[in-house]
Amino acid sequence: MKTTFKITLTMLVFAFAFNCNQSGTVDKSKANENLVIGLVAGNTNGSTSVLTGLAEVRGVWKDGFCSGGTCTGFSSTLSIAQDPTGFGVWTTGSGYYRIIESSNTERYLIYQYLPTATFGNANKYTKILWTQPQTTDCENGASKCFYYCTVLNSSFTGYSTLDEARNVSTTSYSSTNPKTTGCGGFGWSKATFLSSNPTSWP
């Protein structure tokens, strides 16, 4: 009887420990389901979003950052286009993101991180605001340029759902003085035009 009790107690302890260990994890099937939903939406909206919703910012750009009234950097490449598989994509540096939603009239897009994203961003969503492209005050002799701002939450990560990213308040964001402030307390990023179509993909 004592042996049976000990075995039962041991099994309960292991079960409790296993459940505690799993309590902070995401169900793999649910994560995959969310990703599939996002990718299907991205694929469905690929042509429409890229060719219409992103009409004024499509192309390849040099990526810089503004602070204290000056924009510098412009060493990494930003591509906003449609990749060979038909998805709308936003790529910059080593980052590669699927564009899920965009609006050329409201000047925003939402992209989804890949499942391999780090810093707690796997499968999450981020909203990007941009300004109307201009043909003056563009660094490095570029023919046109625009400012953009990444809208993050208080943890500086993406949003868990598409609705969260879509409905996040942007009333505190302003492009009135993008070289100095207006993007979460910082200056905006700036993109200077290189070409209409990307020549290679990550």
Language-model-detected regions and their locations in the chain:
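Edge beta-strand at a domain terminus
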Residues: 157-202
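Bacterial Sec-dependent N-terminal signal peptides
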Residues: 16-56
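Sec-dependent bacterial lipoprotein signal peptides
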Residues: 1-19
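N-terminal glycine/threonine-rich, aromatic-flanked beta-hairpin/loop signature
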Residues: 64-157
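N-terminal secretory signal sequences
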Residues: 27-31, 54-57, 69-71, 156-174
